[in-house]
Amino acid sequence: MREEVLTMGKRARQAAHHMAKVGDVHKRKALEHMALNIEGAEAAIREANDKDIRAAVAKGLPAAKVDRLRLDAKVLEEMACGLKEVARLSDPVGEITRMWTRPNGLRVGRMRIPLGVIGIIYESRPNVTVDAAALCIKAGNAVILRGGSEAFHSNRCLADILRRSLVETGLPEDAVQLVGTTDREAVLDLLKLEECIDVMIPRGGEDLIRFVAENARMPVLKHYKGVCHVFVDDEADPDMAMRICMNAKVQRPGVCNAMETLLVHAGIAQRFLPPMAEAFRAAGVELRGCERTRRIVADCAQAVEEDWYAEYLDLILAIRVVNDMEEAIEHITRYGSQHTEAIVTGNFERAHRFLQEVQSSLVLVNASTRFNDGFQLGLGAEIGISTSRLHAFGPMGVEELTTTKFIALGNGQLRS
């Protein structure tokens, strides 16, 4: 298996060298052709996907996991639309981000270049095969994909379509490769391939991400989990705060930018929490609170220490009453995952302090945590949300799949 993975790495390195020179018009054409081929291969994709669905049901996987595997007509349409949207994004490769002139007349700047070869290890959702490959191609990279065993047939079918599309548009098919085995040893071999892979990106549950982070020999862009907070200040507009909290928790509770802990200033807790709790209960949210919360909210379960660290991904919410913003920030610093935090307040100074002192990938004032998303922030498609501070912090779009090199323009300058 080691030799097979090494061969893939070498082919990816050659493909990456070619992709770095490809212009935007050519990349756009390839991505649009991928979309057409996805649309034209619906029957073949559905047939492969049915094999995965039947196997998942036979294994007794939970209905939610089976649903994540499903590639119906709507998902395939979204997949094709996603490819077209990525094709239309601005190409960052070759962009000169800054330029300055030295006293000797030497002009120095920074130019965006592809990362090179990207490895992506992911679970369940077969649409990641297409989404990840599209972003890597747009940024001029090659990618090696290793999907979850549950989606093996779907991933293989989709990867074959992408590779054929590359060939049909004159690009190297090895710019997209899929590890063709469900053997877990292949994952370890991939993580040891630092001579061929420039960066590894895991997408999935916390266990997978920790495994990759602990075993990879190359840099890893990751996010462990989203323990997201909303702090309702005593100078908040209560109606606005209720709308924001409902959206942050209830709209899509199973995603990483959903609120998991609500922090409420003691000065507003008595009048804010009862109607807020009633609205949450009407939406089916289970509430777990601190002692002060339980004195205000009837029938609220006792929160324990583990609740403050929890990423529920469900209709469960931890609530804590705090004395002031300083205590709220201390709580976020101790228990948060540096993903997304929001403050609801009408006080400019407190909002500014919250923005400065809370060190998460997105910090919001008077808006829902659900906005930590590439499209919602105007960045376009994303490969995930990084909670690593090195290289990328927050949504990882096309630009985050590039790096910069220095360039210098002279007219004969010599160093004295």
Curated annotation (Swiss-Prot):
Family: Belongs to the gamma-glutamyl phosphate reductase family.
Gene this chain is encoded by: proA
Pfam families hit by this protein: Aldedh
Cell location: Cytoplasm
EC number: 1.2.1.41
Function: Catalyzes the NADPH-dependent reduction of L-glutamate 5-phosphate into L-glutamate 5-semialdehyde and phosphate. The product spontaneously undergoes cyclization to form 1-pyrroline-5-carboxylate.
Descriptive protein name: Gamma-glutamyl phosphate reductase
Coiled-coil boundaries: none
HAMAP family: ProA
Record-linked PANTHER family: DELTA-1-PYRROLINE-5-CARBOXYLATE SYNTHASE, GLUTAMATE SEMIALDEHYDE DEHYDROGENASE
Catalytic reaction equation(s): L-glutamate 5-semialdehyde + phosphate + NADP(+) = L-glutamyl 5-phosphate + NADPH + H(+)
Pathway(s): Amino-acid biosynthesis; L-proline biosynthesis; L-glutamate 5-semialdehyde from L-glutamate: step 2/2
Cross-referenced Gene3D superfamilies: Aldehyde Dehydrogenase, Chain A, domain 1 (3.40.605.10), Aldehyde Dehydrogenase, Chain A, domain 2 (3.40.309.10)
Family matches, as InterPro entries: Ald_DH/histidinol_DH, Ald_DH_C, Ald_DH_N, Aldehyde_DH_dom, G-glutamylP_reductase_CS, Glu-5-SA_DH, GPR_dom
Molecular-function GO term, any one: NADP binding
Entry keywords, A to Z: Amino-acid biosynthesis, Cytoplasm, NADP, Oxidoreductase, Proline biosynthesis
CDD domains: ALDH_F18-19_ProA-GPR
Hydrolase found in the keyword field: no
Enzyme's top EC category: oxidoreductase
A GO cellular component entry from the record: cytoplasm
Statement: the UniProt record of this protein carries the keyword Amino-acid biosynthesis: yes
PROSITE patterns reported in the protein's UniProt record: PROA
Gene Ontology BP terms: L-proline biosynthetic process
